[in-house]
From Swiss-Prot:
GO MF entry, a single one: rRNA binding
UniProt protein name: Small ribosomal subunit protein uS19
UniProt cross-references to Pfam families, sorted A to Z: Ribosomal_S19
Keywords: Ribonucleoprotein, Ribosomal protein, RNA-binding, rRNA-binding
Family per record: Belongs to the universal ribosomal protein uS19 family.
Keyword Coiled coil: no
Origin: domain of life: Bacteria
PANTHER family: RIBOSOMAL PROTEIN S19P FAMILY MEMBER, SMALL RIBOSOMAL SUBUNIT PROTEIN US19M
Length: 91
């Protein structure tokens, strides 16, 4: 169930303050707020989004508006599954 339209998108207030303070400067903004929704004011800015261990660089484009910051900073690293070897197929 999604968020009610009358409530509007959730964005942490400190992110909006930082965007307003930066203005035209494109300095990366470090944040732990993966839950914040990307709004049109964020387009063209770079965010450093925490993934639980490190900060992932996320450059915001117009296609990302309406999504959450956390969607673009994966928390799990995929280690490939075991390859089929000749030894396994001999059985």
């Amino acid at each position: 169930m999604g968020r009610s339209l009358k409530k509007g998108p959730f964005v942490d207030s400190h992110l909006i303050e930082k965007i307003e303070k930066l203005g035209a400067a494109k300095k990366p903004i470090k944040t732990w707020s993966r839950r914040s929704m990307i709004i049109p004011d964020f387009v063209g800015h770079t965010f450093l989004v925490h993934n639980g261990r490190t900060f992932q660089s996320v450059y915001v484009t117009e296609n990302m508006v309406g999504h959450r910051l956390g969607e673009f900073a994966p928390t799990r690293t995929f280690k490939k599954h075991g390859a089929h070897t000749e030894k396994a197929s001999v059985k």
